């Protein structure tokens, strides 16, 4: 479980001012007041959408505001209501008061729509102030102000795909290449110190959440390194992507068996999760084709399985990739999406 969050202020719109005007037409030289009311300010709504997966759209925002109401018009015409501000969020989003930490809304269900802040009421036009004593009032009301609140959105996310690999195998490079996550990347172990989530957009209508966790080392299940702290974060992912380094001095077989062993010791259920294998750093590998062929033969793995005849004891695919050169990344995204759709 990961927490995505964003903090900013939201405001409803101010009401439009009423109009002070008088009826002026041919043959009506002394017409009475006809100023219309101002339009109400726009409201603020939260809307839950299953096709939204993260709070990325709200990162970096400082303030969001609904539109103000339009001023009233002559001829008793009411100004237009200000456009509403609709905040689209994924299911599972909680809205907190950023100042008091009070839970304000718990947004769970697809299509759920909640009014959060009401717009200010529009001011009255001068037509309302005509009396027997004052037949030509020039008074009109200003609109009432909108409401403002400092909020914090929190989303507890379960990633669809969890990356499993040794430190420095290229997990951070991969997730930064194919998703909207921008983790720290450097050529040393444990660059990733906290889990990172990224939304991978496969096409206009499809995507999934990928999680990058600190690298697993041999003995991680016994508490060595940083991996044990974060293996729990991928316990609820739907698919595991094992990342094995083609340019490493250790054989592909040794790397894979060690990773599998650590995951198995940590959680037998996690080890049974649907999985695929990415053979990384293709651009830096020597004799890559021979290594890949040997690896496939040793385990009797296919390069890619048929989703309708999927043997879950084996990887759905074994794909060489280079995050730096971009090789295999499109196939990787579509392959992972295919497994996830098969799960659903």
Curated annotation (Swiss-Prot):
GO terms for MF: GTP binding; GTPase activity; magnesium ion binding
GO CC terms: cytoplasm
Chain ranges of the Obg domain: 1-158
Sequence ranges of Polar residues compositional bias: 1-12
Gene Ontology biological-process entries: ribosome biogenesis
Family annotation (Pfam families): GTP1_OBG (PF01018), MMR_HSR1 (PF01926)
Residues given in the record as GTP binding sites: 165-172, 190-194, 212-215, 280-283, 322-324
Keyword Magnesium: yes
Cofactors named for this entry: Mg(2+)
Enzyme class: hydrolase
Assigned EC number: 3.6.5.-
Region (Disordered): 1-36
Record-annotated OBG-type G domain positions: 159-341
UniProt-annotated binding residues for Mg(2+): 172, 192
Gene3D superfamilies linked to this entry: GTP1/OBG domain, P-loop containing nucleotide triphosphate hydrolases
Keywords (A to Z) from UniProt: Cytoplasm, GTP-binding, Hydrolase, Magnesium, Metal-binding, Nucleotide-binding
Coiled-coil region: none
UniProt-annotated location(s): Cytoplasm
Subunit structure: Monomer.
Cross-referenced NCBIfam families: Obg_CgtA, PRK12297.1, PRK12299.1
Biological function: An essential GTPase which binds GTP, GDP and possibly (p)ppGpp with moderate affinity, with high nucleotide exchange rates and a fairly low GTP hydrolysis rate. Plays a role in control of the cell cycle, stress response, ribosome biogenesis and in those bacteria that undergo differentiation, in morphogenesis control.
Name this polypeptide is given: GTPase Obg
Lineage: Bacteria, Pseudomonadati, Campylobacterota, Epsilonproteobacteria, Campylobacterales
Gene: obg
């Amino acid at each position: 479980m990961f927490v995505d969050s964003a903090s900013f202020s939201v405001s409803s719109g101010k009401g439009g001012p009423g109009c002070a005007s008088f009826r002026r037409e041919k043959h009506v030289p002394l017409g009475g007041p006809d100023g219309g009311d101002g339009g109400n300010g726009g409201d603020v709504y939260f809307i839950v959408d299953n096709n939204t997966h993260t709070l990325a759209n709200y990162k970096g925002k400082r303030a969001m505001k609904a539109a103000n109401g339009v001023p009233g018009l002559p001829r008793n015409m009411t100004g237009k209501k200000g456009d509403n501000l609709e905040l689209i969020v994924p299911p599972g989003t909680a809205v907190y008061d950023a100042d008091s930490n009070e839970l304000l809304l718990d947004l769970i269900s697809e299509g759920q729509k909640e009014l959060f802040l009401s717009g200010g009421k529009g001011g009255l036009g001068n037509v309302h102030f005509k009396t027997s004593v004052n037949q030509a009032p020039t008074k009109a009301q200003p609109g009432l102000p909108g409401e403002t609140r400092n909020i914090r959105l929190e989303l507890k996310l379960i990633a669809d795909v969890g990356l499993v690999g040794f430190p420095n195998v290229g997990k951070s490079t991969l997730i930064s290449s194919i998703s909207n996550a921008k983790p720290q990347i450097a050529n040393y172990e444990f660059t990733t110190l906290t889990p990172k989530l990224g939304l991978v957009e496969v096409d206009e209508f499809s995507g999934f959440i990928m999680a990058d966790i600190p690298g697993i080392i041999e003995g991680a299940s016994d508490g060595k390194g940083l991996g044990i702290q974060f293996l729990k974060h991928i316990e609820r992912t739907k698919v595991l992507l094992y990342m094995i380094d083609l340019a490493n001095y250790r054989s592909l077989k040794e790397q894979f068996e060690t990773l599998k062993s650590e995951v198995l010791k940590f959680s037998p259920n996690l080890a049974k999760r649907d999985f695929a294998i990415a053979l990384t750093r293709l651009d830096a590998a020597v004799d890559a084709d021979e290594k890949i062929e040997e690896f496939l033969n040793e385990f009797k793995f296919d390069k890619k399985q048929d989703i309708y005849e999927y043997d879950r004891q084996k990887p759905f695919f074994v794909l060489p990739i280079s995050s730096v050169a971009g090789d295999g990344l499109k196939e990787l995204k579509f392959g992972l999406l295919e497994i996830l759709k098969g799960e659903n």
